[in-house]
């Protein structure tokens, strides 16, 4: 697929979102993620309204946008299994392992991925990396455990920074971890989740994307 618009980053995000929407089938329970790329997806979903049975949203922000467009947004507990979940990423490697959570919705995003039959990740090519970790890794933490968790993360080689004035939709805080070269995403995802006080972290390796749709500066769309 090629598009003729000026290939700035927003247009690349929009192109990836439009391509992902083509995977929507009739009577679908659709999971919708969070972030700037997903914002373009939500706009595109208007063209698929007759195919979408209901929508499960990973954040309050996306829920507001979806409801404003007239979509039936339901709680995951009532939706059951999600047929297709579409979301963006902050980083993506060749194995479709991701860093997500720059928008602080990582826990709900991870729940949606776990409950979905298929997960499509939409990115522009600036998000593609060989090794995860250049983007700071978000970790959602119970507030009273912040200092303890930070000390444990330092032992793993990271430099945690408290994301001030950010409270997640679940009422928790975010530590952004810098200077972690994530050579083994599966191992680190597990190790971080085992720290008492951690809700989850932004590595998506135990359950990576099934398909990545990437918009490139040359105007093409690559799927892998």
UniProtKB/Swiss-Prot annotation:
Active site: 109
EC number: 5.3.1.6
CC terms in the record's Gene Ontology section: cytosol
Alphabetical list of SUPFAM superfamilies matching this protein: D-ribose-5-phosphate isomerase (RpiA), lid domain, NagB/RpiA/CoA transferase-like
Top EC group: isomerase
UniProt key word Transmembrane helix: no
Chemical reaction(s) catalysed: aldehydo-D-ribose 5-phosphate = D-ribulose 5-phosphate
NCBIfam families: PRK00702.1, rpiA
Name recorded for this polypeptide: Ribose-5-phosphate isomerase A
